[in-house]
Amino acid sequence: MSRSLRGAWKLWGSWCAVIAYAGFLAYMSLRQFGDSPIERAIDGVGRAYFHLPAYAGLAGLLTLVMPSSGARGRRVGIAFLAATAYGWLLEAAQIAAPTRSFNLRGLAFDAAGAAAGATAAFVFLVLREKKSRRGS
């Protein structure tokens, strides 16, 4: 398999992972919340706190799979905005979902998680670039 074809498959697979993860977030955000022991434990902690790692993961994935043309900062900003907007869209969609409700705290944790994930991915990219320069 040629190098360019292998790169295309890798990129396609990466975007499939982002789409699958976004679908998982939508499912978890919009499904009915039941009364199982796990769900009662989640309620005890507070559902909004789960937004932090969820949207950190989405923003991190987006940062890593976006094309590297242009400034890294732009890539991080776009990933942050996209993950935050997606979280806010799902938060607004919860208005119509039974057993769910719109929550301002959820909006704040979506944005905070997206910022943390995009920043962590940015640091990873910078360190990886420095390491590859030293190795060359």
Task: List PLM regions with ranges.
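"…centered on the first transmembrane helix and the immediately adjacent amphipathic helix/loop
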Residues: M1-V65
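Membrane-helix interface segments
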Residues: W12-G13, V45, A71-F80, N103-L104
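Alpha-helical hydrophobic membrane-insertion segments
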Residues: G13-C16, G23, G77, T119, ...
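Small-polar-interrupted transmembrane alpha-helices in polytopic inner-membrane proteins
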Residues: A17-S29, R75-I95
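Interfacial helix-loop-helix junctions of multi-pass membrane proteins
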Residues: D35-G44, G87-A115
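Membrane-interfacial alpha-helical segments at the cytosolic side of multi-pass membrane proteins
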Residues: A54-S69, A114-R128
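Short, charged juxtamembrane terminal tails flanking transmembrane helices
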Residues: K130-S136
